[in-house]
Amino acid sequence: MIRATSVKGQHRWSEAAADTVVLDFDDRHRRRTAMVGTRGLQFLLDLEHAVALRGGDALVLEDGRLVEVVAAAEPLIEIRGSDPKELVRIAWHLGNRHLPTQIMAKGLRIRRDHVIEEMVQGLGAKTVEIEAPFDPEGGAYAPPAEPSHDHAGHDHAHDSHAHHDHDHGKHAQHDHGKHDHAHHDHAAHDDHHVHDEHCGHDHHGHGHEHK
């Protein structure tokens, strides 16, 4: 099986992609795993270190071909406060519970969880259930961003949406709506979010982890 051994960051490549992989937040945090593109290309992601992939990145195959990474839409809750102070207070409570949180210009996004949604509403915020790519903060202990060069094994900061127009085809849906906030140590990939821990959730599709 051909391997993908390095990553090109968003806006650092312009070639036509040989295929596309549509991945949710968890599946974008891998070091070594088998993947299948939307057009059927099978390959092994085999990086030196786990990388926080973003939508618009490209995985570089051994033969030089590229596979574009697209961030899959996930069931999320968007939190909107009446003022910045209220949002900061809510963000503190979310961080205190080790919840991955995406910071928006005028709100916060977390994975859909009705218990947390009720807590946030009790703090005075408004919530809206949405389907969107999830790109939470990397956390204080995440490696520094390195967007200026191609890399294998480094995180990078840029927008979570793909930058090419094409048909992504059918892909597995990921339902992270129900979870119990248990914290797991995923051996095959690093955590890259607030407090560097994940809430418990299932992984579906995109092959199996290889140790």
Curated annotation (Swiss-Prot):
What's any one GO cellular component for it? cytoplasm
By its UniProt entry, which SUPFAM superfamilies does this protein fall under? Urease metallochaperone UreE, C-terminal domain (SSF69737), Urease metallochaperone UreE, N-terminal domain (SSF69287)
Pfam families reported in the protein's UniProt record? UreE_C (PF05194), UreE_N (PF02814)
Location of this chain's protein in the cell: Cytoplasm
Q: Which residues form a coiled coil?
A: none
Name the family. Belongs to the UreE family.
Q: Tell me the function of this protein.
A: Involved in urease metallocenter assembly. Binds nickel. Probably functions as a nickel donor during metallocenter assembly.
Ranges of Basic and acidic residues composition bias in the record: 147-202
Q: Which InterPro entries match?
A: UreE, UreE_C_dom, UreE_N, UreE_N_sf
Q: What is its main location?
A: cytoplasm
Q: Which GO terms describe its molecular function?
A: nickel cation binding; unfolded protein binding
**What is the recorded name of this protein?**
Urease accessory protein UreE
Gene3D superfamilies hit by this protein: Urease metallochaperone UreE, N-terminal domain, UreE, C-terminal domain
Gene Ontology process terms (BP): protein folding; protein-containing complex assembly; urea metabolic process
Q: Specify where the region named Disordered lies, as residue ranges.
A: 134-211
Q: Which UniProt keywords apply?
A: Chaperone, Cytoplasm, Nickel, Nickel insertion
Native source organism of the sequence: Rhodopseudomonas palustris (strain BisB18)
